[in-house]
Amino acid sequence: GEIYDLIISLTLSIYTPSNYILPSRMAKYADLNHEGKNSLTQAGREQGIRRLMSINLLKRLESSVHSFRLTLQRIQKLIADTLETINVFDPSKTMELQDFTAGNTEFDADDAENDLLAVGKKVHIALADMDYLTWQQDLQADLQILNLLVGMVADITPQHDSKLQMLLATIAGKIAQPIN
């Protein structure tokens, strides 16, 4: 219902910074679209990561509310850190958006396998080359939705997360009787 609709409404623009590169500056980043034999563009990779993160949020919600909340909070921090970089940006000075996802290393094995954080670690885009004000607005809109989602699940503690408790009981049973 409502949580699903909110997740779907997220732009997750934190994962698609190249969408905000100014047309007049695109040539500077043309090599991002041609890495040897790989025909997948940087924008294509970013869109793929954005889709994976949307799916990841839905998967987390289905698996456990606690896991979902942790993922929401990590994305919140990533966006808040990026917004802070934008807020202190002075257009008269050069400032790159370096490793904007580097601090977000606490994803679980599923996230690591998908290399969801590669965009910020591999690509550096100068904020001066971006329509950073539009990006800032999109990031703020996502942050509001994430804050709402976290608020909606805040009262559900791990002790009251039925799916998590079932999983813990299954694990305890397997430990007590290791052979099926």
Whereabouts are the PLM-identified features?
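Helicase motor interdomain insertion/brace
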Residues: 1-180
